[in-house]
Structure formats: C-alpha cells, structure tokens
Amino acid sequence: MLKRARTAILSFLAAISLLVDGPLTATAEVRLPDATRAGFAEMLYRLDCGHSLANDESVWTPGENFGRSIEFSSTCWLIQRGKEWLLWDTGVPESALNDPKGWSTLPKLIVYHLDKTLTDQLAAIGLKTTDITYVALSHTHGDHIGNVRLFPDSTVLMQRAEYAWISSPDGPNDNVNQLKALARKLLGTPKHLRLLDGDADVFGDGSVTLVSTPGHTPGSQSLLVHLKNSGFIILSGDVVHLEENFEKDTVPSLNTDKAASIASMDRIRRMIATYKAKLFINHDKAQSDELKLLPAFYD
C-alpha cells in the first residue's frame, strides 16, 4: 500500500513539473490593493456547487455539538473582469448529480449531493467551460476541486504550498492521506498551472486579489473582489466554515495548523475593517441561502 502511494505521488510530480506556467505577479510581499484606487470587477455570480450532510458537528465546532448532524453549502463563484472570467472553486464532481447515495471525501464523516451541474449553470448565462480564463482554487479538498478537469484550457491558480502538500509523502493521519490522494486524482495534470507564493493581483488592477490564508490546509487562500456598487467582498474559502468559527476563533479539528488558521482569521478581520468588506462564508448554509444565486449577481 505504501509503495503504491509513493509511486502515485512520484507520477503526479513528474507530470505536473512539465506543465507549470509562468507566474502571475505573486509573492508573499505583494501588497493588498489600495481601497481608494482598486479597479472594479463587473459581476460576481454565486453558483450552487453542492450541499452536504455531516454526522458530527463537533468536528467543525470543537468542544460543542457532539454527535449532532449539520448541513453545509458548497459554493462556487464566477467573476467577470472585462472580457475575462475567473471561476473560484469547482465544487462537487458533476458525476454526483442526483445520485441518491451521494459522493464523499471522507465517507465516515460527510456525504455530498449535487442538484445542478456547474456546466448547466454556466450555460444559463451563455458561457461554456472554454470561456473561463482562470480557475482559482481556495484549496484542494475534493468538494472544492471536483470539476477542475472540465476546464482544460483555463489557467489553474493555486498556492505552491498547497501543491507541495498534496505531493508530499503520507503521514500518520489516514483522513489527511485520503484527502491528499483524492486531490491528486481530481486535479490531474492541468495543461496550464500557475503556482503562487502568497498574495496575487490576478488582473493587475486590484479588482480581484488572491489572499494567502493558510491553516485549514498549508496553501489555503481566500479571494478579495472589488465591485462598483457592492464594494469589497471577501470569499472565504475554508478559512472559516461557519460564522460561529469566526466569532469564537474556533478551528475545526480537520485542519493542518491551528495557529495559522487563527492568524488567517485575524488577517481577514483586518481586511474587513480596512475595506469595509462583506465576508461570504463558503460552507455556512444559513448565510448562503440568503445570498443571490445565478442568474442574479452582485455588481
């Protein structure tokens, strides 16, 4: 088993090493945009990328809610900037559509269901997968990267630390090993891959900025979007799963670095204050149910 896992990792590394594109302007020292001078993205759409039922809420709220089930949303976001489009995460695999058994990253803990496909939602506003310039990944858990392979012509943006993590040898935690193996399978070998080292100004004008928020995974990131009428919006990724995490500084047990997670939450708090930004939390179903859904949009 260990030999097979090592062989799979080496094959993944060999394939990816041939495919990495040149970098965006992206380093740990890149400054976040000036709130008064940042450009604007035209539109921000929320896409329904699945929903899930977990059997123990305490995994996400340590010390509380033992054995209580909880439902999560899975959200993707689509951003228009001029003639270009950026897709933030790709959600649960389309193969899970209407499957009564669902799909899972960790079958003993959580099951995901899908009611509509990503491609159908794009088609509803006249887009094809080939119209998407960038696919930016908050991190590599399967419910966020399930459809990356539908976008072979898009440039995939992810943190170098995240790529290194899923490429690393297995450790003692079986859940983590399982998540990393699934990530390698779902990511495959993108034709265009850019590995980032920290924050990145995607379009060069401060309208859309990838923000390094490690902790949940080593290369987790969030997204800062600037819109003319809606102002600044932060798309959380999994820096938090629930508003309660943010309010209480609670870090889910399924996490790679608790201290880094708390530091990342603090960073998001500072950004909210600096930009007077709204925070949209990916998995918080109560919040997601109140947000606009494609074809409606934020501008």
Segments (PLM) and residue ranges:
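Active-site metal-binding motif and surrounding structural segment of the metallo-beta-lactamase
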Residues: P100-M158
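Cap/insert and terminal regions of metallo-dependent hydrolase folds
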Residues: K108-D120, S222-L224, N229-D299
